[in-house]
Amino acid sequence: MMQTPFHKFFLLAMLSYSLLQGGHAADISMPPGIYDGTTLTAPFPYTVIGDPRGTKVTSSGSLELKNLDNSIATLPLSCFGNLLGNFTIAGRGHSLVFENIRTSTNGAALSNHAPSGLFVIEAFDELSLLNCNSLVSVVPQTGGTTTSVPSNGTIYSRTDLVLRDIKKVSFYSNLVSGDGGAIDAQSLMVNGIEKLCTFQENVAQSDGGACQVTKTFSAVGNKVPLSFLGNVAGNKGGGVAAVKDGQGAGGATDLSVNFANNTAVEFEGNSARIGGGIYSDGNISFLGNAKTVFLSNVASPIYVDPAAAGGQPPADKDNYGDGGAIFCKNDTNIGEVSFKDEGVVFFSKNIAAGKGGAIYAKKLTISDCGPVQFLGNVANDGGAIYLVDQGELSLSADRGDIIFDGNLKRMATQGAATVHDVMVASNAISMATGGQITTLRAKEGRRILFNDPIEMANGQPVIQTLTVNEGEGYTGDIVFAKGDNVLYSSIELSQGRIILREQTKLLVNSLTQTGGSVHMEGGSTLDFAVTTPPAANSMALTNVHFSLASLLKNNGVTNPPTNPPVQVSSPAVIGNTAAGTVTISGPIFFEDLDETAYDNNQWLGADQTIDVLQLHLGANPPANAPTDLTLGNESSKYGYQGSWTLQWEPDPANPPQNNSYMLKASWTKTGYNPGPERVASLVSNSLWGSILDVRSAHSAIQASIDGRAYCRGIWISGISNFFYHDQDALGQGYRHISGGYSIGANSYFGSSMFGLAFTETFGRSKDYVVCRSNDHTCVGSVYLSTRQALCGSCLFGDAFVRASYGFGNQHMKTSYTFAEESNVRWDNNCVVGEVGAGLPIMLAASKLYLNELRPFVQAEFAYAEHESFTERGDQAREFKSGHLMNLSIPVGVKFDRCSSKHPNKYSFMGAYICDAYRSISGTETTLLSHKETWTTDAFHLARHGVMVRGSMYASLTGNIEVYGHGKYEYRDASRGYGLSIGSKIRF
């Protein structure tokens, strides 16, 4: 199997080393081929080179080495090794593959033992290492004893290692008895990988399941995801470990792990005793990566002292099981984990048997990132994040929300939830003694959401001031949604919102509000954290908002009210422990963010009195009764209308010396105003749609009458109609689109013409809120026109009359935002009658190229009505019948021109329209669940408008004529278009 070229490579390497001792760096060509240990007829020539001036090995073709084993040799070696100087392996676009390599020295595939210099692997199409093993070596000692020495790294470098400009890099199922299942180096730089970069199922019995470094790990500017999948370390760092006590250890300040400007960073299914994904004795930073994901990494088990004495416990036993995804701790300086300018950051289902389900660190900083999510991580303490003594936390939601949800920690107390017979409780962040939060802020439209609580341990030597939402543009939300949140800080709120969801507690040393607002839901508590020793704390609130829906629900109000109430009220609470003084001033606000509270019949359909706020002013020193408060906002303009009155009463559940008061709010109902989703203006506006469909039939009739004169004939026309009315203050608009056909027959009797027509249209309408409808309309028409000469052959008089009846079926769907969609059908009836007269004036053909000028005046009477009908379902409405009448008078002039060479005709008409009379009854609507009734009018079409119409006729034969007809009508806030194309057969 191509043995000779590789033996020549071995000889050339030795010769180059001997000849270049005093000259330039060696440049050696690597032979191509496949070298399979199972078929080689001679031992594989393991190659060791070294040149103080450096060595560059250049690939001359793709090379694959597999099934090689020198693990029990007297002198086990790597396939390629370097002893001195810089070492570079240049691929020149070829592949380098190692498979099933077995040895008992550092670097089963490649090793660099040079004490200084740089090891570079570059420019390969593919670098792949599969199933390579570096086993324990047995070293003889004096006295006939032996010592077992573990081997490190499938690729090993005593100095810095660089992997760059390689299209595909993969390390699969490699195993080492020491550190670095795939790579063990002083520092490692991975840069410019283009198509694949995967470290999968590598195992190190000590540290760094995939990679271990003793100084710096850096992955920068890679165009593909860096994937660390299912790697295992017996001690630290299932994926990556930066360890200060490794081979060639650097100082603690040299250590760091950095990922910057990569397409993606992925750690999934890695495991170790400490740091399931990453372990570092220095800082860890993520900067500018498009996506960073840590999923299902595990740090386990914790250290258990043996029952029998003997032996020394491991130095890091206290950290066993810490850092399910990331472990970062520096005993000398702050070990910081930072995420800056990241696209997406996602931690989910990571598990720590000890502390920090996702992250264990001394300092954590998240800033200028897109969405950041910690979901479903689990630990004994610090479900998502654990920060050690004197730790620091900085959270800034700049380009996306920061969310903690479903993270759990183990509990030893009763009453906690049970998962697989283990008592657990929600927990986002745990901070040990002396910790502080330095930044907590969210940009406008962003939020930091604690669906799991954050807890700080007592014992801060100096209480720090935390300014929430500090900085220009930080007016977002800090939301505490579950559990007991404890912040041993003096909180200052200058802008944005602090929100407490139902049954949530927020305990702080003090809170001063100079701006922004505090939002509380029913059952939430804002209280003082108990410090040791006790401190004189205070709260000063000036802008407090309450969720009305939550208060009503937690008060258990009903319609009609019950006495006693059906449940014990659960108002918001401020200052429950009486460990400080509380002042609250300025107006308070009732908020109905989803606009449902004022539309709930069970809540505000009757007069109510609810408990809003239980306020403990503090017992030391005694405080006066709270000042009267006013309501800063009125009730909603939709739903139930009424007024609130506020009143303080002593809290009967607490003794007077506690200075506890209850703020009660009394509601007096005065009426009901339906919201835009309730109104259903489409019902009454459908009457206009029926009139428009009949008018389109009349336009088709008018087009069939014009054209060349004939005795009798039949015609057919396709028609379309579009009408739009602007939205009103409620957002209610109207759009009607219909199309169909019209067919008719005309017959002349002297100077008079009589005709019949049938029209069928199919339409769609919507109100631009939540209603849309389909309709089907049938129209029957009869029409008569006459024309008489008044003065010779130039002046004539004509008149016409048209009458139509239309019957339409409407099918409306209402897509509520708060309830299921409803469907209902009803019928419309419509009658339209037109009369008109004109004064046709014949013109000489040379004048304005016109043949006829016809001033005219018309009168159109339209009447439409809809029947009574009732919806079904929880949101059912009953609609009474309604009608619409309109008298319209168009006045205008029509111009006709006939071609002098062809039997074609062109017609143009312009008219001013005045609606002289209109009556709209409106539709009486009843919301059955509320027993509330209102009347909805159809929109009032502007009384004045203009209309233009044009037609063109072309005779195909002496008996067949085709034509097109279009019209446009404009009124203030509305416009309509119509088009018809048809054909006539003359007899």
From Swiss-Prot:
Acetylation as a keyword of this entry, yes or no, is no
The Autotransporter domain extends over 707-987
Compartments annotated for it: namely: Secreted, Cell wall; Cell outer membrane
Q: Which UniProt keywords apply?
A: Cell outer membrane, Cell wall, Membrane, Secreted, Signal, Transmembrane, Transmembrane beta strand
GO terms for cellular component: cell outer membrane; extracellular region
Q: Name one Pfam family in it.
A: ChlamPMP_M
Q: According to Swiss-Prot or TrEMBL, what is its membrane topology?
A: Peripheral membrane protein
Signal peptide start and end residues: 1-25
Check the record and name the PROSITE patterns matching this protein: AUTOTRANSPORTER (PS51208)
Q: To which protein family does this belong? A: Belongs to the PMP outer membrane protein family.
Q: What is this protein's name? A: Probable outer membrane protein PmpG
Q: Which organism is it from?
A: Chlamydia muridarum (strain MoPn / Nigg)
Q: What is the lineage of its organism?
A: Bacteria, Pseudomonadati, Chlamydiota, Chlamydiia, Chlamydiales
